[in-house]
Amino acid sequence: MNLHAAYIDYALRRSQHMQAEMSGADNVLLKDYQLFVAKVFLGLDSMNSLLLFQETGVGKTVTAVYMLKHLRFLYTSWTVLVLVKKALVEEPWMNTILRFAPEVAKDCVFMNYDDQNFHNKFFTNIKTVSARSRIFVIIDECHNFISKSLSREDGRARNTKHVYNFLARHIASSHNKLLCLSATPIVNNVREFALLVNLLRPGVLPPQSLFHNKRLLDEAELVSKLGCICSYLVHHEASIFEDVEGSELFARKRVLLKYVRMSAKQEDIYHKARAAEFRSGIAVFRVHRRMAATFAFDEFPVRKNLTPDEYDALVASLVRDFEALFAGRALSDATRARLRAGEPIECAASAEDLSLYQALYEHSCKYAEVCVAILASPGKCLVFEPFINLSGIRIFVKYLEVFGISYIEFSSRTKDTRTRAVAEFNRVENTNGELIKTCVFSLSGNEGISFLSINDIFILDMTWNEASLKQIIGRAIRLHSHANNPPERRYVNVHFVVAQLGSGAPSVDDDLLEIIQNKAREFSQLYRVLKLASIEWIHQHCREFAPVDDEAGFRALCSRAIDVTRGASTRRALATGENIWYAFSTLMITVHPGFKTEDGRVYDADGNFLTTMPERPIVRVQGTRLVYIFPELR
């Protein structure tokens, strides 16, 4: 990697005239890490692509705009194509450009990759690009673009894949540039890593699997051939299920699993939802169970023999019945005051209020318990609920009203008002939630926005992957996001709210937690590759190089094919030792059977080597089990 380091050194020398201040209608002083990335990417003309793998809140947009402002350092004529979700065009992109680099606005063409007609608009715009102009492409939240480029289940290519193929073929040619931005570049499966790499470095990654028994075949080969593929700035490398200590820049994170038992009515509806999924053949998606584990109407709405309009009318009537049942009802001021003081509901509530609470709990153990926890929180709260209508946010806000909790909503229902509402929520005067206590948000709010001074986040329903959950949590733990809080309140408690069945059988929430953890094991290995191949890691750790005076060999260095044909060798042997239990997190979401040999080697149940037992292992007790914790295996 020393040769990569030599080219980074060359880029920094060539771009040393670039200053940290960026001025337009407003001024901003770039952080050292932002200026470093810009100097390297613009200092190497033949560095055609770069991934900004940087966590939320560190200024990826500002870094990208700074690059646009200094493009003429390389060449006089550029066309800038910004591929972005529609919700993020005005804020942060256009706002940042107009504040700090208004002169480049005329060169920028914004296209929304979440537009159904995106591919046609893209190729229409490409045809208008002058032959004399170079192209600078920015893909914001590139994991979304990549996921839209994956083939469908039936093997048919999506329209976005045509845009992907064009970029892979043409951007790496000549002297065009491609900048991809993401805090979570891999979201759903490892195929996304292959697509991302072959977009940034076309043709270097072979079609063979990179894994054997969920372990990377050759980390060193990947790191060597992918040198300088990205900028890596991730302060919180730990799993979302691990606690993270705070720093001067970031708040402390503590993770809590909040188990709540379904009422008899909710559990009955849950089992009906499960049966309906299996009858209709959609059990794999778990949609009905997820909704029932969150909220249950008086009856389960069955689609059978109903037209779509009839089914919608049935659900609407159930919603109206629920809203009518609790219309005008609210907990007393005295009960709310005791709940804010931290008293349990059984002690805090009068007989009338307790009856009201139990009626709410009967429909949703999650909603009722979370409202109690919000009142007890000393600061502001976020509540994530992906479902909006039916039994989702529309119902949850009724719970907030009964509990007397002030709130804003950030979802597709509030497109016209949500940006202003977040600004009010983030005001210094509302640091402790005096004006607005809670923000309820859907997946609309997991990218591109910041929430300040949050003390508690409640995850009411699991997503299918850790990356989405990281984005959600990252909305509240950002650079200087808790600067207005006193030191003792610079923390964020993340509550994963898990519905439990009375029988003790795993619920849909338990299933999703296990799926998330299994995916995360492979993702974390690929993230480590990106870290070790990043320009920051190479610049800091590879110092034994001879300076270069040009970049003639850089493109060839980055075009070498990756060889993963060596595969994984397997050797059979008889070992003596003992059976053990192990987990990847102290939360022990999933506990696995394993085997420890007499010399301390640890294997999984299939005999695959995992790790060597440390001298002072982390051990936890779960029921009658002694469980070893191996967080490094994630």
UniProtKB/Swiss-Prot annotation:
The keyword Nucleotide-binding applies. Keywords: ATP-binding, DNA-binding, Hydrolase, Nucleotide-binding, Transcription, Virion. GO terms for biological process: DNA-templated transcription. Residues 355-531 form the Helicase C-terminal domain. Its EC number is 3.6.1.15. DNA-dependent ATPase required for providing the needed energy to achieve the termination of early transcripts. Acts in concert with the RAP94 subunit of the virion RNA polymerase and the capping enzyme/VTF to catalyze release of UUUUUNU-containing nascent RNA from the elongation complex. NPH-I must bind ssDNA in order to exhibit ATPase activity. This is Nucleoside triphosphatase I. It comes from Molluscum contagiosum virus subtype 1 (MOCV).
